[in-house]
């Protein structure tokens, strides 16, 4: 930026004192300081935005490079798998696996799979709550019945200290 030393600042201050006058100099100095601060903040914001854009562009380039590398690896794997499958089929004498067993691999469904699909991985709330023993629930203060705060106070207040209401 501009190289301003102590001597140059003193010279600028003396000229401003003579030109502007001692009454208006503090107000002008505050205004100039505020404008300089605003300009510095704006410059810092622009620098940060430019650096973010540069980093974003670098990340985009890296992402495309990684995606290309992943596609290359995937192609290589598929190529090797198809070559090995072809070599295995040739070694077995060209027998088709689906013709031999009467169906493909997708026709085989294990017995646990159908039971698992029935629940879709979810247990009912009652099953989860019933899984804990009652002594554990009592020891860890697991609530069995939902009560309001007033109902809990009434339940645990000693009988002698209860206030009688007009309607009881």
From Swiss-Prot:
Record membrane topology: Single-pass membrane protein
Transmembrane regions listed in the UniProt entry: 1-21
Keyword Cytoplasm: no
Predominant location: membrane
GO molecular function, one term: protein transmembrane transporter activity
Subunit structure: The Tat system comprises two distinct complexes: a TatABC complex, containing multiple copies of TatA, TatB and TatC subunits, and a separate TatA complex, containing only TatA subunits. Substrates initially bind to the TatABC complex, which probably triggers association of the separate TatA complex to form the active translocon.
Name of the molecule in the record: Sec-independent protein translocase protein TatB
Organism: Cupriavidus pinatubonensis (strain JMP 134 / LMG 1197)
């Amino acid at each position: 930026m501009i190289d301003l030393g102590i001597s140059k600042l003193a010279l600028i201050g003396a000229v401003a004192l003579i030109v502007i006058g001692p009454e208006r100099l503090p107000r002008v100095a505050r205004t100039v300081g505020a404008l300089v601060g605003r300009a510095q903040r704006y410059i810092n914001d622009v620098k940060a935005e430019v650096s973010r854009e540069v980093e974003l562009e670098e990340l985009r380039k890296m992402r495309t490079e990684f995606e290309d590398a992943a596609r290359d690896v995937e192609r290589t794997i598929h190529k090797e798998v198809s070559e090995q499958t072809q070599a295995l089929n040739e070694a077995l004498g060209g027998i088709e696996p689906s013709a031999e067993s009467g169906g493909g691999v997708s026709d085989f469904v294990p017995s646990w799979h159908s039971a698992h699909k029935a629940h879709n991985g979810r247990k009912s709330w009652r099953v989860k709550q019933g899984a804990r023993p009652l002594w554990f629930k009592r020891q860890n203060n697991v609530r069995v019945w939902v009560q309001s705060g007033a109902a809990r106070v009434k339940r645990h207040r000693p009988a002698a200290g209860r206030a009688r209401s007009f309607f009881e």
